[in-house]
Amino acid sequence: MWPLTVPPPLLLLLCSGLAGQTLFQNPEEGWQLYTSAQAPDGKCICTAVIPAQSTCSRDGRSRELRQLMEKVQNVSQSMEVLELRTYRDLQYVRGMETLMRSLDARLRAADGSLSAKSFQELKDRMTELLPLSSVLEQYKADTRTIVRLREEVRNLSGSLAAIQEEMGAYGYEDLQQRVMALEARLHACAQKLGCGKLTGVSNPITVRAMGSRFGSWMTDTMAPSADSRVWYMDGYYKGRRVLEFRTLGDFIKGQNFIQHLLPQPWAGTGHVVYNGSLFYNKYQSNVVVKYHFRSRSVLVQRSLPGAGYNNTFPYSWGGFSDMDFMVDESGLWAVYTTNQNAGNIVVSRLDPHTLEVMRSWDTGYPKRSAGEAFMICGVLYVTNSHLAGAKVYFAYFTNTSSYEYTDVPFHNQYSHISMLDYNPRERALYTWNNGHQVLYNVTLFHVISTSGDP
């Protein structure tokens, strides 16, 4: 167990944001994020488990690797000494080679001017030196081999160092670096959140007061973090004007926006922006419309079979809120009801490309008794009122087709909520409350396993 300043085996960290997800997907890395939840002051409490076998199980491999690296280092040093010696010898060999060539040239040039005796002496000397020529060539070849071997040893040493680093065989210093890296990753847990059960809603954050009593505002739930555009739709029926602000700051100041004029008017406030398109309910129909902002055109529209519309099955506040579209971590949803379901809330997964219903669930909860609803991680959360004193009262789990009654209060500051939607990118609830655009942070509690267990 690696010694820490907090009681092992848990490392607790406070990171600003919301509840977090597993930061290490590979259990071989050792560190695990076990739970995370949001504290009352809005900080994310991340709990990391440090396995006891962090280095002990690697001691044998680490020791063998260090011994191998020491051997390679010794060989490398010996190669450097040998190279230095052969370099000096090679200079002498090259001098001898030059001398032989000089003698051979002189012998050829003086063939006719030397006496027979002198010529024979030179010839005999050259004959003695000739066998040395092949020796010199072999010596030069061996020298080149030594140079190549030195490079191979150097490369091997670098590879072993990389392996050692990968195995984490640096003892205390290595673990210290790993802890620092872990802390950095844990501090980013708000940007790497996983799914969990809703256990709390923060105090409201009023972003702006703009527009009428009813409306909707949102950001793209699937845009990259650099894209902070805000869309604003005032009113709950027959509207066609959508304002697109460049950033949240521009929305607050009411500047730098463009206008989209929808070809067909909307009904209700249950719109959502998903992957560059607006999904909304066409006025006086049960038709879902997908409007693409960049091309300023309707890409597809489709009826929801049997879905009520035109205030047939609205939320408790009315406002043509028969159909409510939502996006969570798993995709696009529609919340509505039908005569066949006796006015109970139906949750359907929609294909975002074709708008076809992929699967539906009957929650058993009467829609007219619901103030608003939102989806988080495949769970539909329903409030019991749109007025003051409202709380998250009911949860339906699509993964198990089961439900439970909850008691999660939240502060309805302006006493009339007409839009409540969860943004999975920002892990926040967007609310239109009596002409005020409001944000809530949420607390998600979850237990995460990195060992492959569900």
Swiss-Prot record:
Keywords: Coiled coil, Cytoplasm, Disulfide bond, Glycoprotein, Membrane, Nucleus, Secreted, Signal, Synapse
Family annotation (SMART domains): OLF (SM00284)
Signal peptide residues on this chain, from the entry's feature table: 1-20
Glycosylation sites per record: N74, N155, N275, N310, N399, N441
Disulfide bonds: C195-C377
Expression sites by tissue: Expressed in aortic smooth muscle (at protein level). In the fetus, expressed in the brain and ocular tissues including lens vesicle and optic cup.
GO biological process, one term: signal transduction
UniProt-reported outcome of changing T86M: In a colorectal cancer sample; somatic mutation; no effect on secretion
Record-linked InterPro entries: Noelin_dom (IPR022082), Olfac-like_dom (IPR003112), Olfactomedin-like_domain (IPR050605)
Protein name: Noelin-2
